[in-house]
Amino acid sequence: SMEILKDASSTAIYGSRGANGVILITTKKGAVGKTKVSYNGYYSINSVAAYPDRMNLSEWADFKREAYRTDGQWGGPEDDAKIFGSAYDAVKSNQNVDWVDMLMQTGSQMSHSVNISNGTEKTTFNLAFEYMSEDGLVKMDDMDRYNATLSLSHKLTDNLKLNANVVYTYLDQNIRRDPFNRSIYYAPYGDVYNEDGSINVLPFNDGQTISPIAEEVPGAYKNNRLTSHLVGNVGATWNIIKDLTLTSTFGFDKKDIRTGHFADTYTLDGAGNYSLADATNHSDVNWSWENTLAYSFTLGKHNLSLMAGNALYKNVAEEYKGAGHNLISSTMLFYNLGGLQDSQQISSSYVQTTMASFFGRINYKFNEKYLMTVTLRQDGSSVLAKDHQWGVFPSVALAWRMNEENFLKNVEQLSNLKLRLSYGISGNSAVSAYQTQGGLGKTMYAYLINNTENGAYGYYPALTPNYNLGWEKTATANIGIDFGFFNNRISGSLDIYQQKTSDLLMQKKVPSSTGYSLAWDNVGKTENKGVELVINTQNFNQKDFSWNTDYTFTLNREKITELADGTDRDISNGWFVGHSIKTHYGLEKIGIWQLDEAAEAAKYGEKPGRIKIKDQNKDGSIDNDNDRIILGSETPDFVMGLNNTFKYKNFDLRVFMYWRQGQMLHSEANGYGSYRIQGDPGIKVNYWTPENPTNEFPRPEKSYSDSSKLDALGYVDGSYLKIKEITLGYQLPKSWIGKIHASNIRIYCSLKNFFTFSHLDNYDPERGGSLSYPMTKQAVFGINVDF
């Protein structure tokens, strides 16, 4: 089970690690009684949720002809040979190839897990095993995962209890390089296979363009990642005397990742120039030791709980990497880097970070009606500058159970009414180590001696030092109310909050004259304020039929209130005072110049068919300095969730819907680079021609090159409504399953991510505008068995 903590008071005790909220995960534990065994398994069929259509060969041919016609270089079929060159024969024969489709496959996922638990009065345990395998949507993407979990608790004496939790995961992944950023823009033709059926790595007549499926040639490509991850903790709880408890927990988290990558000469990575291989070993070790002393007592109507503690955290990350070009034999893959003949590179790194914390909490209750919590925590982080490493973070919360008051106690319709107030300060030090110290990077330079090219390494300033880097601090005020009516058939909560963050930790662009590009800094202040509403209703609750609804609504308004150096804008980073951090700033497209607007278009140096940009300052010209505006934000106006659960006899149905409204995306499918206005192949769009005077996309034009105006095509409304999941289940009757001594068997099927409603055609806006790996939809079939 999971519990999400968000307000300042409940997260304050977790310090900087809870700066963005806390998710409490309660894992399964053993219980006293007979052994319980459960099995859960499922199989899913995965496919692409949505992906933009590409131009087929005839559509691309028309598109390219139009681009040349606009420039007066195409007047009819007699000019085809001139403009298509080596593609002319394919265009004549309509030899169509969809390269993106060639990469894809129907994916699948399979999981089997077994859980065993038991316990005595002194010892309980829970043991779980899981195996999961997956074949991705892209060929050569696959994964196998093995997982084992042990939870153990032992009562050593009447007042001393020991516990241990261990999770081990082993992951074997084959990961194909993202081929979409190339295949989308390939001309939709080519000789995909040789006469013998093997893959043709040079499918075009130019002798240099590598096939996007060249990696599928046996032995030509391998990108494998092995992950071994061990997480555990051991702890003891000692009831020293009545109401006084000492708890000590030691945690350990070790992750080892080995990544090996090989690409032969004729692959997308090799690009026809050389084979390449690299191998990386990365180790990440986290240690923690947490100790708390808690005391509580009750005196009459008063209850007081006190807690004090400290925690130590340490992280050590090591990495070793070797790489180079031109293996003696491709069969070596990445297992024998000594066989690399050129551009050999060896690198290593060691990163250590530490944190120390001291904290305390007071909980006070009077008559179970009036509650107060006060928390104080001090964190020290090694990643910050020497004189700024320690931060103090207090919080206070008050609550009033109003339904316990005499004037409300007899209101039968009221089940719960609790008013909450909280205020607290949290800290964030989430930056990489050594940002305060600066550092050098290494690169290879070529030089000539006796007309022979040689290589030598040079060093350059790669990391900007910041000797004043300190804590990012967020002050959060929250007022909330928990409510329940009609014996909690209607229940929920309403929260109104305001967060003010100062000394924001962000990377900012710095002038190139400094020799650097980016630097971490405390750059300014932001404010978030909003409303969160949760409503749970039991609509029907009869013997054979029930219907429950869970509704969530979130509204957040984010803005920058101050930037470094007192400026109101930082255009290079896209930051503007009074607006969201994730703001889109650019030229505003208001349509396409039409034929009857030729005279007006000419005033701006344009002509019908080109993008019409709004002249913001009405000076008669379009330029980046005066006509770019804030177009929108990636932060939505609101987010809603609606979950309905129906049960009829042994059947259950769950439908979960998700609505994200008012966000702007910069879509790679629409913007400069994807819309190849000069006639190159790409995404299929509705473009302007004299015969098709649309306002969506401009006319193809061979000589057009104004990228800032083309970039305006990419800003789109990213609002969407999704039916995220539909699950239908059936619980087998007890009379059926008793013969195999099972206590419960449930079979189910789910549709995940199947239905999306948005303004975007053939694109899932949850992907955020990117054209890389597409979103997945799943048809899942599963079974749960308990013995």
Where are these regions (language model features)?
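Periplasmic plug
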Residues: 1-8, 40-42, 46, 126-128, ...
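Residues embedded in well-ordered regular secondary structure
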Residues: 21, 29-139, 177-179, 215-224, ...
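N-terminal plug
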Residues: 1, 8-17, 47-51, 450-452, ...
